[in-house]
């Protein structure tokens, strides 16, 4: 989000709600944890594969995620601060796996699916079976749809570059017509997506057209 200093140069914001997508990830993880417990499963330790902690979106995301899982059996035991992208997700997860020897990693939260995809690779190389030993939840849908379809990733949140672009154009048109925006902050939708809903997930764009998930996500979808 624009800070107070930047607002003198920016007439409005169009984009994702970091809090909402992290909250939705937390709710999905709660759902997965409840199902595991009901089936007699044990172990609810969570590894967070995060954005760099100096990045503004990190604080918004981790706090919303913690609020969403509060009161559940889930406990964060590690928070990776390696960087963006698959390579950093892999590197950070590998380091944390070594650092957490003796503790089980039962759930993984990825602040975006690119980071999570790298983390999943590191977990698998360490001998863990995704979807069985470890349950993974991500956000942003910039990873690989196949991970969800194969059950290696429980879910993600749908963040659509198409919606961000359409909303930005809509706000520019509004500003040119009226000289101001009705709302300075304008968020795009970030609904949850799981294996059960992935085939039927669709969103209506700001142009009124209906788009499927393969048109909306930016990863290997």
Functional labels for PLM-detected ranges:
Residues 18-21, 25, 29, 57-61, ...:
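Stable alpha-helical elements in mature extracytoplasmic
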Residues 1, 11-12, 45-49, 78-79, ...:
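Structural recognition of the beta-strand scaffold that forms the well-ordered cores
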Residues 43-53, 69, 160-221:
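Hinge/cleft segment of the Venus flytrap/periplasmic-binding protein
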Residues 29-37, 97, 168, 172-180:
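Short, hydrophobic alpha-helical segments
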Residues 15-25, 44-69, 75, 81-87:
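Extracytoplasmic ligand-binding site segments that recognize negatively charged/polar headgroups
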Residues 1-5, 19, 52-56, 82-87, ...:
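Solvent-exposed loop/turn segments at secondary-structure junctions
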Residues 64-65, 77-78, 82-147:
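Hydrophobic alpha-helical
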Residues 1-20, 39-45, 141-154:
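Flexible loop/hinge segments that line or gate small-molecule binding clefts
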């Amino acid at each position: 989000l624009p800070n107070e200093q930047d607002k003198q140069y920016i007439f409005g914001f169009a984009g994702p709600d970091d809090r909402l997508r992290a909250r939705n990830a937390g709710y999905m993880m709660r759902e997965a944890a409840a199902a595991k417990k009901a089936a007699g499963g044990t172990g609810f330790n969570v590894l967070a594969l995060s954005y760099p902690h100096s990045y503004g979106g990190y604080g918004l995301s981790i706090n919303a995620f913690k609020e969403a899982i509060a009161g559940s059996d889930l406990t964060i035991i590690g928070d990776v601060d390696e960087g963006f992208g698959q390579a950093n997700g892999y590197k950070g997860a590998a380091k944390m796996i070594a650092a957490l020897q003796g503790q089980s990693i039962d759930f993984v939260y990825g602040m975006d699916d690119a980071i999570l995809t790298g983390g999943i690779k590191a977990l698998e190389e360490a001998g863990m079976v995704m979807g069985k030993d470890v349950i993974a939840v991500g956000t942003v849908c910039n990873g690989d749809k196949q991970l969800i379809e194969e059950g290696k990733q429980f879910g993600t949140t749908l963040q659509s570059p198409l919606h961000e672009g359409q909303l930005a154009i809509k706000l520019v048109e509004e500003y040119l017509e009226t000289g101001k925006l009705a709302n300075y902050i304008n968020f795009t939708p970030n609904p949850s997506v799981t294996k059960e809903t992935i085939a039927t997930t669709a969103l209506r764009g700001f142009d009124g057209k209906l788009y499927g998930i393969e048109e909306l996500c930016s990863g290997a979808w």
